[in-house]
């Protein structure tokens, strides 16, 4: 009996220690189901951003659902439809069947910004930590109950200490918010042009690792603006496709091009390869390490792009894993 009691006590202590040390802000425990319907975003601009950077992010988000006949192809919305197609494979499969047909149709995920808040003075400091990261998520949520908080960090904020600049400058995760029963899903991205452009601003800046390849001019004219879009697109795609489901989907498949990301997580049982992360640094067909793949260059501005959005704007967006073809889907 004494031995059993000691064992039970030891187990309890282990659990308590685990709970105390487990980071809340960067938890990778996934949500229970794929979001569908409307994805309401609440943006927190933390630090100082240029007008171009803010406009670029808003224009990209608005372009996700812009699939009108007018405008040039390929469109950003075609990329977002690949994200939406993940719903055909899982829980919603039997719900969205076309009338008089057995063919399933993925419901649209409408994305819109419902709140935009600016903190240029950086209330919680210029260095991101586990503690103030959680506070930033709370600030982005405000008093809204059904939004996805998106925290955008300016180039003045140092985020390397929480895992940014290590192959990526974004993450989507769950944060436990004070006063709420369920943890909240959120996205956090940073402008890498000062802290680590070689990690997160390629192909607009020379890569720090691997083949350097060719660099291009950003379509907006600002490296920070277009790098933010790439990071935000990655976070949105990975969040909207539900990591819990994609983990099993990719279990027996190889990960193209992102060996560095995989090596950094080899010791973690929680490592999840998300759809956009799986195709990191792939922007067009025929891509290989150091080469973006097939993209276009605007003959007037010299800006690189692979898709079009609202008002004929040009964007360079990351490739995304297509579960139907089991390959990286690219606009070109």
From Swiss-Prot:
- Keyword Transferase in the entry? The reply is no
Q: Which range is the signal sequence, renumbered to this chain?
A: 1-27
The record ties this protein, via InterPro entries, to: EXORDIUM-like
Q: Report one GO cellular component.
A: apoplast
Q: Where in the cell is it found?
A: Secreted; Secreted, Extracellular space; Secreted, Extracellular space, Apoplast
Q: Which UniProt keywords apply?
A: Apoplast, Glycoprotein, Secreted, Signal
According to the record, which residues are glycosylated? 36, 102, 143
Hey, which family's this protein in?
Answer: Belongs to the EXORDIUM family.
Please explain the role this protein plays, according to its UniProt record. Answer: May play a role in a brassinosteroid-dependent regulation of growth and development.
- For this entry, the protein name equals Protein EXORDIUM-like 6
Provide the organism lineage as a comma list: Eukaryota, Viridiplantae, Streptophyta, Embryophyta, Tracheophyta
């Amino acid at each position: 009996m004494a031995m059993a009691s000691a064992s039970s006590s030891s187990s309890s202590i282990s659990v308590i220690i685990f709970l105390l040390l487990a980071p809340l802000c960067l938890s990778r425990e996934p949500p229970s189901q794929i979001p569908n319907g409307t994805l309401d975003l609440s943006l927190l601009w933390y630090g100082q951003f240029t007008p171009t950077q803010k406009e670029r992010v808003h224009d990209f988000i608005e372009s996700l659902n812009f699939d009108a006949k007018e405008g040039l192809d390929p469109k950003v919305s075609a990329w977002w439809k690949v994200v939406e197609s993940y719903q055909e494979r899982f829980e919603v499969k039997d719900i969205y069947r076309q009338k008089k047909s057995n063919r399933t149709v993925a419901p649209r995920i409408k994305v819109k910004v419902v709140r935009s808040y600016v903190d240029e003075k950086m209330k919680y400091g210029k260095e991101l930590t586990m503690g103030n990261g959680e506070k930033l998520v709370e600030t982005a949520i405000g008093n809204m109950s059904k939004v996805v908080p998106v925290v955008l960090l300016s180039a003045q904020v140092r985020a390397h200490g929480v895992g940014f600049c290590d192959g990526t400058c974004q993450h989507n995760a769950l944060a436990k918010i004070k006063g709420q029963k369920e943890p909240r899903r959120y996205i956090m991205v940073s402008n890498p042009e000062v802290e680590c452009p070689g990690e997160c601003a390629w192909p607009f800046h020379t890569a720090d690792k691997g083949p350097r390849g060719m660099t291009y001019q950003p379509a907006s004219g600002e490296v920070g603006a277009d790098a933010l879009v790439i990071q935000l697109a990655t976070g949105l795609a990975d969040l909207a496709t539900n990591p819990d489901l994609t983990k099993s989907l990719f279990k027996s498949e190889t990960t193209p091009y992102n060996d560095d990301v995989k090596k950094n997580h080899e010791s973690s049982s929680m490592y999840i390869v998300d759809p956009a992360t799986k195709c990191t640094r792939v922007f067009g067909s025929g891509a290989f390490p150091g080469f973006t793949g097939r993209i276009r260059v605007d003959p007037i501005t010299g800006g690189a792009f692979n898709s079009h959005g609202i008002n004929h704007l040009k964007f360079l967006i990351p490739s995304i894993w297509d579960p139907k073809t089991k390959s990286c889907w690219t606009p070109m």
